[in-house]
Amino acid sequence: MGVSLVVTSLLYYNIGKQPQKEYAMPTEYEKMIAGEFYKPSDLELRALAASSREKQWAFNAETDRLKRAEIVKSWFGSTAENVAMNPQFVTDYGVNIHIGENFYSNWNLTMLDVCPIRIGDNAMIGPNCQFLTPLHPLDPTERNSGLEYGAPITIGDNFWAGGGVTILPGVTLGDNVVAGAGAVVTKSFGDNVVLGGNPARVIKEIPVKKD
């Protein structure tokens, strides 16, 4: 046997003896937050949703604003120090919501967070606003199978939403964006704009004062 053949044989022998790396299958939660098809009936997700509902009930029953803020800080994926939220508040899981400093929301905020919702500093959210990340298949066979998916929402600093604003899945907004009352935001926009209408469009640009 030639030297090269011996070396090659030993190489393949040693490779075969190496422990094979195990690749764990993604959980339904991991698939969900990645925007892939997932099963909302998964036991882990059902338990997470049940835990979120307990916090939701506690939050909505609490009359002290500081205690409500503490519930939010123990519930959301991340928050800053200054959080002020009025009831009623509705969410799926809560753990996929990330809010910055000086976050304020008025009555009846809905944040459905099958995918991450990220909002920067100094946000002011009017009453009856909705941030919706869930999506359902258009094909009826897929939809009836129970599979769902979603897309994240990302919003920059200094966001102001008037009453009844809806932000749909996959939207990214820049800094200093104002969404006028009743706006339905279906696509992404950059910095320093006022949005209005259904679907929302740029009404005007905002001149920003420089320091």
Where are these regions (language model features)?
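Conserved G/P- and acidic residue-centered "switch" motifs that form tight phosphate/ATP-binding loops
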Residues: 179, 197
